[in-house]
Design a protein with these regions (language model features):
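Hydrophobic alpha-helical packing residues
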Residues: 69-74, 144, 443, 493
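Short, high-confidence coil segments that cap the C-terminus of an alpha-helix
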Residues: 130, 149-150, 389, 472-475
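Nucleotide phosphate-binding/pyrophosphate-handling subdomain across enzymes
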Residues: 151-156, 164-174, 179-182, 192, ...
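Internal gly/pro-rich beta-alpha loop/helix module
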Residues: 171, 185-192, 197-200, 205-292, ...
């Protein structure tokens, strides 16, 4: 089926405009409850019941965890579906399928399938008053069924209990962590938020909990698991090395290397990961805990054995899946390095582009206090350096409903004696962006230095302003504050 590119683009725009999406209108797009999603799925023949799945929720880290786990399963030879949100540059980033380890990378859903699915079902969606996320979730389930995937890794959109994805009955449930975000929908106290996330734990289905240190939160998860007769494992109850050892032992009791070999392998694994942020080590621990349970599932065990025990650990498909998760799954915007060529165009550092400006550029989609508690410290430490500090320039934007009072104290300011970060405040893309002047006023009043770049979608103008007016060789430039800031970057060869 050949489609007209203009018709395809117009159809996608109509979906964004006619059906409420979180990217466009924020909370007004949130339609809690599963009745409408169940009706949509029923009209489509309940495709979600025709493939195995793994369900992942959490305040932060659920996207990275989804991609790492999908990458490992792919490299071990399974045909994997991957559903995540939001997208950065191409709607189709949300829905991907692999053909197993023989393929170089996971592939986005075909434009033809998107077009045909929307044209065939538009009237149904309008009649049911579906949300944008319900439509994309239905599309993902339908596509994974069509592709006959072995397993689909499904990331929750918002919350868990009432999220559109929660009509699946997975093989494993994972909750990465609990923090305060979207509190007006999920609750203002951590146990309330945990209760919403815990809604993805299903009857008899094993559950992995990532970061959970507060007893009140742990209690919520334990009680939910007990009521569902579900085995529950807290990944921070053991070290990554202990989870790796358990994974290998569950695959084959005779195969587990000694502690020294495991320690050396893990250090090498972390150093080679193309998902670079230090926070990825917490996500990796959750993935290893998840794999230790999948190793007990007969459906997954054989593929995992082939991918993990076929050679020395460092040379296995299992290791490759972790080390190259970003490349294999096409995940971008997680502590990602960029380069600027001699004409000021941005490229992924993983490309062959030659740097024309001697500046270290990092972009990250972290967008809430829980996220900045991780990235803020890492940015400041990187700028402070081990010998002489570097100048730190922050291109920063956020959405209008962001709780700035919780984020501002976590932003880098004076990161070394006599060195203060300089901020270029920007409008992120979309109608939800906080105006750069409003953002600047709030942050500068807290003792920061910087200026507002006044332009509609001012992210690229801010970068151009930096190159023209502020650039010095050796600078560290951070771009982030929101997924929409990173999505506004014009990166050569981005999807």
């Amino acid at each position: 089926m050949n489609i007209n590119e203009n018709e395809y683009r117009k159809l996608l725009e109509s979906i964004f405009n006619r059906f409420p999406s979180f990217q466009r209108v924020g909370g007004m797009a949130y339609k809690p409850g599963l009745e409408r999603m169940e009706s949509i799925a029923n009209l489509l023949g309940n495709p979600q019941d025709k493939f195995r799945s793994i369900h992942i929720a959490g305040t932060n880290g659920k996207g990275s965890t989804s991609h790492i786990l999908a990458s490992v399963l792919n490299e071990c030879g399974l045909k994997v579906g991957l559903y995540t949100s939001p997208h950065l540059w191409d709607f189709r980033e949300r829905i991907k399928v692999s053909a197993g380890a023989s393929a170089s990378a996971m592939q986005m859903i075909e434009k033809e399938y998107v077009y045909r699915f929307l044209m065939q079902n538009m009237a149904k969606f309008e009649e049911l008053q579906a949300s944008f996320f319900e439509i994309t979730t239905a599309m993902a389930f339908s596509y994974f069924c069509h592709c006959k995937v072995d397993v689909a890794v499904i990331e929750c959109g918002l919350g868990g209990r009432l999220d559109s994805t929660n009509i699946i009955v997975p093989q494993l449930s994972i909750i990465t962590n609990i923090g305060k975000d979207h509190c007006e929908y999920l609750g203002y106290e951590l146990p309330q938020i945990a209760s919403e996330k815990a809604g993805i734990i299903k009857e008899g289905v094993p559950a992995i909990i990532g970061e959970a240190t507060e007893e009140s939160v742990c209690r919520v998860f334990r009680e939910r698991a007990q009521s569902c007769n579900s085995p529950i494992h807290f990944s921070n109850s053991a070290s990554p090395q202990e989870w790796l050892s358990l994974y290998l032992n569950n695959l084959s009791p005779a195969s587990s290397p000694d502690a020294a070999e495991l320690s050396a392998f893990l250090q090498q694994l972390v150093s080679r990961m193309d998902l670079r942020g230090s926070y990825q080590q917490k996500n990796l621990r959750a993935v290893l805990a998840a794999l230790s349970q999948l190793a007990l599932n007969p459906y997954f065990a054989e593929a995992l054995r082939r991918g993990t025990l076929a050679a020395k650990l460092a040379a296995t498909p299992f290791a490759k899946g972790i080390e190259e998760a970003s490349r294999i799954t096409g995940l971008h915007g997680r502590w990602e390095h960029l380069v600027a060529d001699s004409e000021g165009r941005l490229h992924f550092a993983s490309s062959s582009a030659e740097a024309g400006y001697q500046v270290e550029i990092i972009c990250d989609t972290g967008h809430n206090a829980h996220g900045f508690a991780q990235t803020g410290v890492q940015i400041a430490a990187l700028a402070a350096g081990t010998d002489l500090p570097r100048r730190l320039i922050m291109i920063f934007g956020c959405v209008a409903d962001k709780d700035l009072d919780s984020v501002i104290p976590l932003l880098p300011n004076e990161y070394a004696p006599g060195y203060k970060a300089y901020y270029l405040f920007v409008n992120a893309s979309g109608s939800r962006a906080m105006p750069s002047q409003t953002l600047a006023k709030r942050v500068l009043a807290a003792g920061f230095s910087g200026e507002a770049i006044v332009a509609e979608n001012s992210v690229m103008p801010a970068f151009e302003h930096y190159l023209a007016k502020l650039y010095r060789p050796g600078d560290l430039l951070f771009i982030g504050g929101s997924s929409y800031v990173v999505a506004s970057l014009k990166i050569e060869n981005a999807q």
